[in-house]
Amino acid sequence: MDLIFDSLKGLFNKNGYRLFMVGGTSRDYLFGIKISDYDFATDATPNEVEKFLEVDSTFEKYGTVKYHYNDRKIDIATLREEGEYKDFRHPSFIKFIKDINLDYKRRDFTINALYIDENYNILDPSGLGVKDLKNRILRIIGNPEERIKEDPLRILRAERFCLEYNLKIDEKTKMAIDNNMDLLELINEGKIGEEKRKLNEIKRKFQYEKCKL
């Protein structure tokens, strides 16, 4: 059980909406480690969330609002579909939806596409997330080549997750990463800097590489 999730899910349910743990939150929860970053998904739009919760709506146009719970910053994302990525980072359009079976397709890796509902049921729309979590496999969702070209920062995230959680990279995912390493040179430093910082923190923490890309 998680205190923050329990506190917010009741508020969302009271207002007629669903709330799910997702991404790094559900991944860390299922690995049994302390949750560091809180990511929730909901069928409420940002405008609907703002009616009953005081949030930072800076990134509202991307379908995400931020909520401060004591000293914690929580990302609350509306379930959505996304168009093609034009700038290696942002989709050409987003469409708000109600179905996690569509929302999961925009996420990066199968272990990050596990949804935990209000009753702590594990929902695995990709059909591979639970299996990959148990076997510690990092697998990209969809066509690996297309998904890496969509957002090359997934290359750095893959290496970070592999190191941090002692994961093995799926063969097709590894091949797509190897084929597209040069795309990182096209990303401006502002966008790539935060991912590099997180990766370097993990490398310093472990002082050795469990996964070399």
Language-model regions, residue ranges each:
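Catalytic cores of the polymerase beta-like nucleotidyltransferase superfamily
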Residues: 1-213
